[in-house]
C-alpha cells in the first residue's frame, strides 16, 4: 500500500511540474518574435527592419506647447511611399498614445522632414539623408546593405487642436 501511494504521489507531482512548463512554453510562443528584436530590457522590443520614429511636440496655433508625447516607433517597409497624409496618421497615433482621441493634427511644421543616419559601407563614412514631407511623399529606400534597423526620424512641432 505504501509503495502504491508513493508511486501515485510521484506521478502526480510529475504531472503538475510538466504542466507548468507546458503553459510557459505555449504562452511565450504566442508572441510573434519575428517582427521584433529584444533590447536590453526584457519588456522592450524594437521593430526589426526599417522603422519610423515619431517624436513630436504638439503646439496650438500660437506656438504654446499643449502636449509632448513619448516617441513611438512604427515598422515601415522599403519601397513604400510615405506621404504627408500617412505621416500625419502616424503622428496622430503618437498623440493618441498619450492622450487618446483628445487631439487632432492641424498641420505639420513646414520645415519638418524625415532623416535617417547610417554608415555607408561604399563611401566609408556616416551619411544622413533628409526627406521632405510632401503630398506626393517619398519612397522609403532600402538601406539593408548598410544597416539592419534604419531609423527614419521625424522630430518636429505639430499644430494640434482638441477634438
From Swiss-Prot:
Family of the protein in this entry: Belongs to the staphylokinase family.
Keyword annotations: Pharmaceutical, Plasminogen activation, Secreted, Signal
Compartment(s): Secreted
SUPFAM superfamilies: Staphylokinase/streptokinase
Gene Ontology CC, one term: extracellular region
Signal peptide start-end: 1-27
Protein name per the record: Staphylokinase
Gene: sak
Function: Potent plasminogen activator that converts plasminogen into plasmin. It forms a 1:1 complex with plasmin, which in turn activates other plasminogen molecules.
Gene Ontology biological-process annotations: symbiont-mediated activation of host plasminogen; symbiont-mediated suppression of host complement activation by activation of host proteases
Pfam families named among the record's database cross-references: Staphylokinase
Amino acid at each position: 500500500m505504501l509503495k502504491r501511494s508513493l508511486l501515485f504521489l510521484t506521478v502526480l507531482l510529475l504531472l503538475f511540474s510538466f504542466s507548468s512548463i507546458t503553459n510557459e512554453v505555449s504562452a511565450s510562443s504566442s508572441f510573434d518574435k519575428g517582427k521584433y528584436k529584444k533590447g536590453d530590457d526584457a519588456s522592450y522590443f524594437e521593430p526589426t527592419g526599417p522603422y519610423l520614429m515619431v517624436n513630436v511636440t504638439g503646439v496650438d496655433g500660437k506656438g504654446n506647447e499643449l502636449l509632448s508625447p513619448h516617441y513611438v516607433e512604427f515598422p515601415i517597409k522599403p519601397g513604400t511611399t510615405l506621404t504627408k497624409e500617412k505621416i500625419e496618421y502616424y503622428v496622430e497615433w503618437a498623440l493618441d498614445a498619450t492622450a487618446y482621441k483628445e487631439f487632432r493634427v492641424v498641420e505639420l511644421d513646414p520645415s519638418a522632414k524625415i532623416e535617417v543616419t547610417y554608415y555607408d559601407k561604399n563611401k566609408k563614412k556616416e551619411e544622413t539623408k533628409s526627406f521632405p514631407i510632401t503630398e506626393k511623399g517619398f519612397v522609403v529606400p532600402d538601406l539593408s546593405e548598410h544597416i539592419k534597423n534604419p531609423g527614419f526620424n521625424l522630430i518636429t512641432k505639430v499644430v494640434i487642436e482638441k477634438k
